[in-house]
Amino acid sequence: MKIRAALALSATASGVLAAVVPQQALLNNPQIHHENEKYLIELAPYQTRWVTEEEKWALKLDGVNFIDITEERNPGFYPTLHQASNVRYPTKMEHVEEVVGLTHRLTKANMERDLEKFTSFHTRYYKSQTGIESATWLYNQVQTVIEQSGAAEHGATVDRFAHSWGQFSIIARIPGKSNKTVVLGAHQDSINLFLPSILAAPGADDDGSGTVTILEALRGLLQSDTVAQGKAPNTIEFHWYSAEEGGMLGSQAIFSQYKQERRDIKAMLQQDMTGYVQGALNAGRKEAVGIMIDYVDRGLTQFLKDVVTAYCNVGYLETKCGYACSDHTSASKYGYPSAMATEAEMENTNKRIHTTDDRIKYLSFDHMLEHAKLTLGFAYELAFASF
């Protein structure tokens, strides 16, 4: 995730780097990149610039959002706060008894175990060998969840979506009676902005927290025999994107292909950073889910608010993250309705991201459980919605 608030890290990149590098663990065989290679980034709708990879990381250190459109230059669809798609979402929760029963099966222990392992990889940088290894581990976990639920016998699948940079994205698909599809997303990659190819990037919050949150929601959702057996009206997909930190590269590739295939995507919810609440508490704010209200679909965002109200023990607070702050941007770019949830209001989110100090010890698994509940509620209600 890209935080628009000025990071405490960026006093000036060079001065901070001198202080930080000695404390960072090094990777034995860093990948070497071509210093002069240029990338076309978009910093706002139709505002583009050619930059080197090092310049990309410098922008991120300064809290500047962008999407890398080097390989995906198709004209975008740019929703504003007041725009809404033609999709009509439920105005009330229709499956409270079923969803509440499923949320009781969600556990913090699963998320903590998974996140401990996920953060043990030196880095999940999308061009690194350990980024491939972490993706492989995650793929195997998703596959196990599907197989153990019995959903594989009814057509549920998990696939690797290959990319040129090495780390693949992951797509779990739970078919319904129609091809109308609801997508739940998080990004699996991490980054250390000082030296991405070399330094450790545990990425516990960004976005290890979102990754294990939606994985736990998948576990819970597949406890429903109706869903697992493919009897829900609509199809549900869970996505774990590669290369979000590079400019939403993985999610762009996926939604570009979906657009070419004329896939009927009715909703996409991104969760990026779901575990840090201390910033909000320190600021005198209540623990709550942060819901983006800029560059998202208005109708879907209202539905998301209703889900939080119905199924979570915390409320929500509206917030803004600017253009291109996470992978929901890619869904919007190709005309699909998207929404975005995070751990708090943006000014109170985790400032340790993109360093070696983005660690589990700062996170609240109680809060992550609330995000898992909203994910499960969102998925189940829309699995049975009449679109």
Swiss-Prot record:
Propeptide residues, chain positions: 19-87
Pfam families in the record: Peptidase_M28 (PF04389)
Cofactor(s) listed: Zn(2+)
Amino-acid positions noted as binding Zn(2+) 1 in the UniProt annotation, renumbered to this chain: 187, 206, 272
Disulfide bonds: 321-325
CC terms in the record's Gene Ontology section: extracellular region
Keywords: Aminopeptidase, Disulfide bond, Glycoprotein, Hydrolase, Metal-binding, Protease, Secreted, Signal, Zinc, Zymogen
First-listed, main subcellular location of the protein, grouped into a coarse class: secreted
Signal peptide bounds: 1-18
An example Gene Ontology molecular-function term: aminopeptidase activity
Annotated GO biological process: proteolysis
Transcription listed as a keyword: no
Stored Gene3D superfamilies: Zn peptidases (3.40.630.10)
EC number: 3.4.11.-
Binding site for Zn(2+) 2: 206, 245, 354
Note accompanying the cofactor annotation: Binds 2 Zn(2+) ions per subunit.
Residues carrying a glycan: 179
InterPro entries on file: M28_fam (IPR045175), Peptidase_M28 (IPR007484)
Subunit description: Monomer.
Role this protein plays: Extracellular aminopeptidase that allows assimilation of proteinaceous substrates.
Family: Belongs to the peptidase M28 family. M28E subfamily.
Name of the molecule in the record: Leucine aminopeptidase 1
Source organism (scientific name): Aspergillus oryzae (strain ATCC 42149 / RIB 40) (Yellow koji mold)
Gene: lap1
